């Protein structure tokens, strides 16, 4: 991931204040444990600021940020979920694990359907969890319901770029 040459404004305490160009996701490096702030970006793959290891790419998106997040150059899994959904809670750690396992090849975008109804409608998420697999901006697969890890990994495997 390339560094942003614009450092942004300073806060009164001397640190950087939040930038107006989008929310920040915090990704924890599995290699060294460093917390990394990642902004929505259609280019590149996030790398740890400390050890430069490829980071697992799991972010939360909204109606406003989704298109930038989904424009990634890797396979994207859109997880349409809700806080009250028990099967969604079953799938969440599996997706986190797959994002770690396929760091640099897979981006998981979590969308809370209650907070982002336009995206739920756009992807026709009539049942949740609904997973939408995207490649190069287009939908290549849809998975409705909770699958165990082996079956979910098998469904995603053909859509992942080669190592």
Stretch-by-stretch model annotation:
Residues 37-46:
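Short linker/helix segments within small regulatory modules
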Residues 29-32, 48-51:
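Short cysteine-rich clusters marking metal-coordination/redox-active sites
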Residues 59-76:
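A short beta-strand-turn-helix
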């Amino acid at each position: 991931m390339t560094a942003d040459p614009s450092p942004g404004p300073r806060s009164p305490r001397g640190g950087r204040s939040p930038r107006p160009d989008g929310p920040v996701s915090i990704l924890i490096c599995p290699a060294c444990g460093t917390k990394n702030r990642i902004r929505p970006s259609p280019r590149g793959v996030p790398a740890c600021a400390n050890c430069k290891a490829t980071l697992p790419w799991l972010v939360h998106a909204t109606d406003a940020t989704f298109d930038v997040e989904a424009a990634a150059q890797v396979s994207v899994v859109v997880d349409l979920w809700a806080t009250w959904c028990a099967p969604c809670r079953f799938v969440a750690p599996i997706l986190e694990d797959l994002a770690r396992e396929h760091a640099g090849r897979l981006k998981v975008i979590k969308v809370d359907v209650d907070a982002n109804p336009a995206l739920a409608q756009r992807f026709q998420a009539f049942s949740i969890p609904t997973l939408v697999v995207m490649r190069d901006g287009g939908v290549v697969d849809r998975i409705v319901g909770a699958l165990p890890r082996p079956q979910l990994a098998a469904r995603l495997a053909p859509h992942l770029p080669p190592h």
